[in-house]
Amino acid sequence: MRMTREQDLGRRGEDLAAQHLIERGYALVERNWRCREGEVDLVMTHGGTTVLVEVKTRAGLRYGHPLEAVTRAKAARLRVLAGLWRQAHPERRGPVRIDVVGVVWPRGGQPSVEVVRSAC
């Protein structure tokens, strides 16, 4: 099945976000973890903390910065997903936080990446 342009942009944004975080000392644990309540884009570790990462990617700022797409409702859902992830992975002890990564990747241009730690 072919990806839509939006799906391809989202996948490339997740790839770039993962690489960006790895270059800053994060380690990738899992991609696209799914459960009945939704999906976590990236699960990583950073300094002994498990980090669930939501990645938002846009081709431009016409509809606002991608970080603006994380509404209160989305943040609440991410917190629920964090709890469910912990239940599914009892072997992973220690702190958990939620980071959000905004990627702006204009057609034919250079992408920019912004990370908000402990966003939710």
UniProtKB/Swiss-Prot annotation:
Molecular function per GO: nucleic acid binding
Source organism superkingdom: Bacteria
Matching InterPro entries: Restrct_endonuc-II-like (IPR011335), tRNA_endonuc-like_dom_sf (IPR011856), UPF0102_YraN-like (IPR003509)
Family: Belongs to the UPF0102 family.
PANTHER family the record matches: UPF0102 PROTEIN YRAN
Protein name: UPF0102 protein CMS0765
Source species of the chain: Clavibacter sepedonicus (Clavibacter michiganensis subsp. sepedonicus)
